[in-house]
């Protein structure tokens, strides 16, 4: 190529590369569809409620150090607040086909996961264990360890051969052999120290659990003014979404309900096919752990809406 053409080409190439990269990363144009919604909104079936305040949950168990209370129950998940008093420990167990994960609301626990070095999970930690990997936890220190735990609905734990199963009404435990285990990867890590890594360290949130069954997403953002009530957010087909507030203050608008203002430890629940909007509120940062099944799950938005609300 003649030299006189090289200089103009050299000037143009960086712009072409930038355009190509932008095209690869740009979000595709949204598609229009008629999405089905029931005429009568899906109900809040017990124990599910629009808002469960942590203060009320703790008040119901005042004076007790060992307790469990189911806050969420859907086709896909059961979510429980569980408190273990000082010195208490779980048996070593595992779950057949799904990850179990939890957020530590208060206290400290020693977590032992087969194949990992034991670690201490304190306030704000997120912990997860893949399917068929034995694990146990033990409260350390002088105060109860309180966690919000999410696992597959309707599943009874399994136990290694050396452990004695805890009796479950209507179930028996039989001697078996099996193969195969879940694993950790670039997204699914044993734990996230939210305070150290995210709040102080500046790490981004994003997916903490992501596999073919579960998406548990850490969403952190500064507070914003309350949008118009005509800004509905989005809805999902055939599954509910729920959240635990990990930091700051948040506002939730759920179809058919008044505006919800939630704080750290509160549980918020949106039934399937109901419009819902979740945003950080106030002057600081707000963080929520959003739990949905079957990623990447479909979000239906209002025409012209900003995707991601």
Question: Which sequence ranges carry the predicted segments?
Answer:
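Short, conserved beta-strand element in jelly-roll/cupin
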Residues: 83-84, 94-111, 220-221, 235-252
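Short acidic-glycine-tyrosine-enriched beta hairpin
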Residues: 115-131, 256-272
